[in-house]
Each structure stands twice: as structure tokens, then as C-alpha cells.
Amino acid sequence: MTQAPDKLEEMTQTTPSQIRSIDDLRGPAGRLEALLNTGRDDAPYAALVCHPHPSGGGTMHNKVVYHAMKALSSFGLPVLRFNFRGVGLSEGEHDEGFGEQDDVKAALNWMERNFHRPVLFAGFSFGSNVGLRACCGDPRVKGLIGLGVPVRAEGRDYSYGFLPKCTVPKLFISGDHDQYGPRNVMEGVFERAPEPKRLVWIAGADHFFQGTADSPGAKLDLMQQEIRSWLQREFGLS
């Protein structure tokens, strides 16, 4: 998958949190480069966001990841982002989604040590598949958000046989022109997931939540709105 240009200036965000570099997050492959958007001391949850495939330039600075972070941070939650093994300054080598699941678990362990509160997970594309696999069934994770969940990508196997064990509330958001998530295939994947669950289609959006020829302009704000609305309904965040 080729990523849309995704680098954003970190300090342009409008959320009240501060951004801190994390130096003590380590997985089986070594140190993982990470950023924490700090939250309120009394925040009921912490949040973790995972990035898309590095072969297309995916990092924790990806636009979709950044906007998901903003949605979560708007409720005062501390939000952790990190680069998978072999990406940016993270040690190790890319492992096609296998070792990356251990990276997610290492991030959950770090959050458990530092926050002592339940976690909400969000991931985009490759990051959604890897993160859902790692988080499903983990009692520390109380909510799951899959953004641009990939169900058809040439040369990669994105299977979802694990979904039946994902019993916590789930939100899936895809563009109705997602080139890696055809509607009929994505709806079949969604059917495998148990309730509670919600699937939202963003009209005129592609895989990266950018616009189409018939509906130009990025749809990232719409994606953010859907995340916020769901968090308010499911978790009572305000």
C-alpha cells in the first residue's frame, strides 16, 4: 500500500495535552520509538494508536493516526503512539505483522505499568489488523477502533478469524471508496464480530480518508467526529 503524505507538525495540535518522548518502551526486538500525548490525571482510560504498513511510509506520524490521537486526546485521555520494530528509530526489523503483535503487547505492558487504568485501542490499516489481533481477548483493553481495516491487499494475507473473541465494544470506520476494503468483503468481516459493534462508511473517502474525484477534500474530520460520537455513547466520555 502506498501511503498518502503523512507528516504533520506535532505541536500544531489543538488538544490541551502535552507531547512527551518515551524512552523506556521496549519490546522483544529492542527499544520502540514512542510519543505520549499526556492526559488528565483523572482520565478513566488510556489510549493506544497503531500506524499503517511501513513499506508505504507508515509511521506514528501518519495523518490518520494523528487525527485518531486528536479524537481520543480531546477527552483528556493519555494517548500513546509508537513506531513498530524497524520503523523510524525503533530497533529490530519489520516482521510482516507477526513480531509487531508483540510490539503492541509491549506497549500495553508499558501502559499498565504507567497508568493502571483500562485501555482503548485504535489502529489504521496494517496497524488495525496487527493491533486487533494483539488486543482481542486482552482484559486490559475495553474498546477497539479499526480505521481503514484492510481486507484485500495484494501480496498480504489479512484474515480475521480471531474476531469472534473480540467481545468488547468495537467501532470500524472505512471510506466507501477504500481500495483495500471493498464494501462487500468488509461487511462480511464485520459480520464475524460479536456485538457490541458498529460499522461506519465515510462517503466519498478512500483508504486514507482522502477525497475522491466526485467528492474532493479530506474526510479526516468526519472520521474524528465518528470516533468522538462513539466514545461518548459507549464509554460516557465528555
Language model regions located:
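Alpha/beta-hydrolase active-site loop
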Residues: H94-N114, R133
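Catalytic histidine neighborhood in serine/cysteine hydrolases
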Residues: R192-F209
